[in-house]
Amino acid sequence: MRILIVNKFLYLRGGDCVHSLNLKQLLRNAGHDVCFYAMSYSQNIVCEENKYFAEEISFSAKDLQGKIKAASRIIWGIGVVQNFKKLLEEFQPDVVHLNNIHSYLSPIVAKLAYQRGVKVIWTLHDYKLICPSYSCLCKRNTCEACFTDKKHVVLRKCMKNSFPASILAWGEAMNWNKNKLSLWTNSFICPSQFMAEKMQQGGYPASKLQVISNFIGEEQVQYIINTPNPIREEAYAYIGRLSQEKGVESLLKAASRLPYKLYIAGSGPLEADLKKKYTANNIIFLGHLGIMDTIELLKKISFTVIPAIWYENNPLSVIESLCCGTPVLGRNIGGIPELIETSSFNRLFTQDEELPSLITKMFNTVVSANRDELSTAALQRFSGEHYYQKWLEVVGKE
């Protein structure tokens, strides 16, 4: 088959980008012809189809023209249509596989593919289709008000705590609504059962929702298998974005009361403030790590912690940890329980107050874990081959 993968960016920026790049390699290894569509950006991987990419826009533009251009992209997809049509005409895809496309690109790509009779598959990495501000959070609390009435994003200033930004998010949601998106899309891939249930609550038909967990890329698999396991440190780690919805400050508060070494691997808007605030010797900020450095960290620590306060979908950080044979302590929220309830060495928590005692318990219990067995089981569960077979089933659905 000829498959066109669409994502906002084409470099190792976040989980959606990692998934898109891994999917490309998986499908090419299976003998398919694959190309990309993204927004032009200086850090993108260079490929032949770069010439068709959408013009770059900035949401931090200060001038009126830049703001109008950004708003026009969000509401109407201005700057996307012409080149995407050209790519469809030249590449002639059998399947267009969408990932994160709102704002920097546009859902108009689903419409254009649909109008040409091309099958559209859409992997959902966040809750944008039912929550205009992506995260189902309002004032640090989970919120589902917009599942049935999008005006709440404006009333509560959910987007960046700004009326203009929230009005724009409302306009985007009203234009690219569930009726249009359901018509243009053959199947939505929900990486967790939790997400599929929330999509149904938001009005999307169950018949269009298929649950397939994310997978780990072949390059990562080989590195995990071929890298010797070091002696485990009496240390644990948080690996991910340093932003409010990730709940990392809850973990840092707990770590400040404990003697164990905590590695913080990641960057984001809270990075500078957290570094200033948490200066204890047992808390080590590593910054953003590449894929291979992440694996090496996972192999040497005792366990990871996922303290997210939002509805985590199917976090790659959990999958990568499990595939390295490293247990996980995760908040009982979103799709996290689906990933970690398969082993007695993993634990769930609900309240921040539980963290200090549970972290101590984790250190006491993981010492008896057979890391090789845990890794082997996870690598099989989250293999590319398993994902590919499920993907073929979805593509075959009408």
Walk through the language-model features, giving the residues of each:
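Carbohydrate-associated surface elements
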Residues: 194, 215
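Nucleotide-activated donor-binding/catalytic signature segment of Leloir-type glycosyltransferases, i.e.
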Residues: 272-292
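A charged, aromatic-enriched C-terminal amphipathic alpha-helix characteristic of glycosyltransferases
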Residues: 75, 353, 367-396
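Membrane-proximal helix-turn-helix segments that form the acceptor-binding/catalytic region
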Residues: 115, 128, 144-187
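Conserved acidic donor-binding segment of nucleotide-sugar-dependent glycosyltransferases
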Residues: 342-354, 361-367
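Short hydrophobic beta-strand element within catalytic cores of glycosyltransferases
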Residues: 327-330
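N-terminal subdomain of nucleotide-sugar transferases
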Residues: 1-43, 116-119, 253-256
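A conserved mid-protein helix/loop that constitutes part of the nucleotide-sugar donor-binding site
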Residues: 18, 234, 238-257, 269-272
